[in-house]
């Protein structure tokens, strides 16, 4: 990871426990990590559209929370990378836990009656979220957050594999695409961390536009944001299929995937 900021900036000296590989205040005096900030748009705008469409289609409120949870992560991450302040770091990292808990609930409760509420997993996930929050506020160790987040992601992967193996195998392309895109982001996140010094040296020699492409933490945002969005589509497709709706994946302008859900056919 990068050392502390070597340029003065609007938000002052970083107070966060993490400072990523992008040079601080290299592009804008008002944004500490420019590319790591603007790359969060993929986690902010598309999920807002998804939440609105979910409401229009009259679907369960849990999926509105799922979409808005991803938006909350994007907004928090924007604030964190823009400022590199500790409070904004928490605004990024804690919603990652909370939103992933919503994802877990949606996916593990997708084969239940419509509008059913299972309070047991809600209580378990709530206790998990509170416990992680309390421990992380006292023990400011990023690896703890990363392990807890990874645990939730592992739960989602296992459940997804079960669904596409034993229940709806035709959803494998959507599920595996989501997982592959997410893991590509995770790979670049690790490269950015491990080879930070090499990347920073290379950027000094490359044209600015080319150097921007090597901002692998920004690519982590883009790919994991897309992977998480596709996971919501997979979860929603699974749920609405079980409820006898007629979900279809369509592409806005032939590029961006969305779910269109038609009501069950009337006999």
Where are the regions a protein language model picked out?
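Multi-pass alpha-helical transmembrane bundles in non-GPCR membrane proteins
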Residues: 2-267
């Amino acid at each position: 990871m990068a050392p502390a900021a070597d340029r003065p900036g609007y938000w002052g000296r970083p107070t966060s426990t993490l400072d990523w590989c992008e040079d601080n205040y290299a592009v804008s005096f008002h944004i500490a990590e420019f590319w790591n900030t603007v790359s969060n748009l993929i986690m902010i705008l598309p999920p807002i559209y998804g939440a609105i469409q979910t409401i229009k289609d009259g679907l369960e409120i849990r999926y509105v929370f799922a979409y808005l949870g991803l938006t909350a992560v994007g907004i928090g991450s924007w604030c964190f990378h823009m400022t590199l302040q500790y409070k904004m770091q928490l605004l990024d990292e804690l919603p990652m836990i909370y939103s992933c808990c919503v994802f877990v609930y949606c996916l593990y409760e997708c084969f239940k009656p419509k509008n059913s509420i299972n309070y047991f997993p809600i209580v378990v996930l709530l206790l998990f979220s509170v416990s992680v929050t309390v421990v992380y506020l006292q023990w400011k160790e990023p690896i703890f957050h990363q392990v807890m987040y990874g645990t939730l992601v592992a739960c989602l992967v296992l459940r997804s594999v079960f669904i596409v193996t034993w229940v709806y195998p035709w959803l494998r392309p959507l599920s595996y695409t989501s997982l592959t895109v997410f893991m590509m982001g995770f790979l670049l996140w690790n490269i950015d961390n491990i080879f930070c010094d090499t990347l920073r040296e290379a950027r000094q020699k490359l044209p600015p536009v080319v150097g921007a492409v090597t901002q692998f933490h920004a690519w982590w945002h883009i790919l994991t944001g897309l992977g998480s969005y596709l996971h919501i589509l997979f979860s929603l497709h699974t749920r609405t299929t079980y409820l006898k709706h007629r979900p279809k994946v369509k592409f806005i302008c032939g590029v961006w995937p969305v779910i269109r859900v038609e009501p069950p056919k009337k006999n």
